[in-house]
Amino acid sequence: MSVVNSILDQIQLPRMVRVRQKFDETMLDDIPGEVVRQLSRTEIASQIRPGMTIAVGVGSRGIHQIDVIVRAALNYLKACGAEPFIVPAMGSHGGATAEGQREVLANYGITEVSMEVPIKSSMEVVPVGVNEDGFTVYIDKNAYEADGIIVINRFKPHPAFRGRYECGLMKMLTIGLGKQQGAQVCHTEGFPKMARNVEMFARCIIKNTNLIAGLGIIENAYDRTMELHGLTSEEILDQEPALLLKAKKNIPTVIPTRLDVLVVDQMGKNFGGDGMDANVTRRFLVPGMEPDPEGPACVVPLSLSAESHGNAMGIGAADTTTRRLFEAMDFEATYPNALTAALAGSVRIPMVLDSDKHAIQAAVRSVWGADPARLRIVRIPNTLHIEQIEVSEALLPELRDRDDIEILSEPYAWDFDASGNLF
């Protein structure tokens, strides 16, 4: 790409400054103890009987200390005399294969050895009913055949739709336990109707299965557990909307807005369903989601996390990227996710450049009317961990006097290696 590289080498990048963004730091000190306190509520504990088999649904998200949370729940159930086992509840993730979903759990330290319970991973589903709109509703066969079901998930705004129930326990029932087939049916009408479908499908599951409870997690902006909520099936229906609103107030944001370029060191399924959380990037993939006027002109992901196992869902939100990321993509892992979600645009390939430097320079070149002396650039590690970020020198005047920003360094040049990469 000698011609391309010669064009890009002329583009100057501004000096950067490291800053700390300050958010609410409230967090739980005793996570295992709180898990037990929530599950031992009379409304939940009264449903757990000695000898009953309980399927515990665990998803694919990079939830902080999810292994600790799951282990505490399993230990409590065993102490009650129940016989719990784990079911991967992650729709079509893990390449839509049983072994792939088992591997996703293993990435989070969740294995049969570490949890001391069986993991029943299968893509086989059974119909549990027909919802109000006439759609057949499916859930994991192993979960359906258990004496009871408990699901564990984080409350969070969804990057592709808005509604009373977004990412949380209702969606875990519908999409997670629905596996590939159930998730595909729920996505049939696309994201404009997803809010209604998640609710209608989940209500059908609650009505026709032995759902004991859900364990809902609210994280602070630093990816730490802020609250845990053990909810019965009826409480999920009634209380999840308010808990979602609380979660929305605590999601991290990139404080500088109207950027020319947002550089994301790493994208991946462990950071969000679309690889880069649109609630952070302000770059939405779904038709019908209004473009955010505060969003960046260009988005540049530099690499794909190992935890994604090649699933680059969300790469379609990028304007440029690196050959390193492109070569890490596994289309067999990526395309089932996009097809299940009926979002072909989410996996469109952006311009691929040889190095981090050239990918960033290509993005700068693509910004219409950008002032080279006042380029607004932010670099973040990923969309889940954005406490410490880098900002271009031109952003300092508007950030320097803010109470929620701490300047950590003097301006410095980008630290590219001999190959033009940052890491």
Explain the meaning of each model-derived region.
Residues 39-55, 78-79, 256:
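Glycine-rich phosphate/diphosphate-binding loops that line cofactor/substrate pockets in enzymes
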Residues 53-62, 85-90, 378:
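Short glycine-rich or small-residue beta-strand-to-loop segments that form or flank ligand, phosphate
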Residues 100-164:
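An acidic, phosphate/nucleotide-engaging active-site surface
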Residues 135-225, 230-235:
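Divalent-metal (Mg2+/Mn2+/Ca2+)-assisted nucleotide/phosphate chemistry catalytic cores
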Residues 226-279:
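A conserved active-site cap/scaffold subdomain adjacent to cofactor or substrate pockets
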